């Protein structure tokens, strides 16, 4: 009975450690100049394809209506 209790305790401890490592590894952030997404955030600044302090608007040609 003692062996079974110890194995269950070790198993639960391993699961708890894996959950802790998952939180630590997935909560990282990226410095300026590195590619980012909403799921891979910047440490500071704004995500505009790469981590930047300010996003610049991309101004291009507007579509024209053709008849």
Swiss-Prot record:
In the UniProt record, the signal sequence range is: 1-26
Location in the cell reads: Secreted
* Organism encoding this protein: Conus vexillum
Q: What are the Isoleucine amide sites (modified residues) in this protein?
A: 59
Q: What does this protein do?
A: Inhibits the vertebrate voltage-gated potassium channels Kv1.1/KCNA1 and Kv1.3/KCNA3.
Q: What is its main location?
A: secreted
Q: List the disulfide bonds.
A: 29-43, 36-48, 42-51, 47-55
**Domain notes per entry:** The cysteine framework is XI (C-C-CC-CC-C-C).
Q: Which GO terms describe its molecular function?
A: potassium channel regulator activity; toxin activity
Q: Which residues form the propeptide?
A: 63-67
Q: Which family does it belong to?
A: Belongs to the conotoxin I2 superfamily.
Domain of life (superkingdom): Eukaryota
Q: Which GO terms describe its cellular component?
A: extracellular region
Q: Which residues form a coiled coil?
A: none
Q: Which UniProt keywords apply?
A: Amidation, Cleavage on pair of basic residues, Disulfide bond, Ion channel impairing toxin, Neurotoxin, Potassium channel impairing toxin, Secreted, Signal, Toxin, Voltage-gated potassium channel impairing toxin
Question: Under what name is this protein listed?
Answer: Kappa-conotoxin-like 1
Expression (tissue specificity): Expressed by the venom duct.
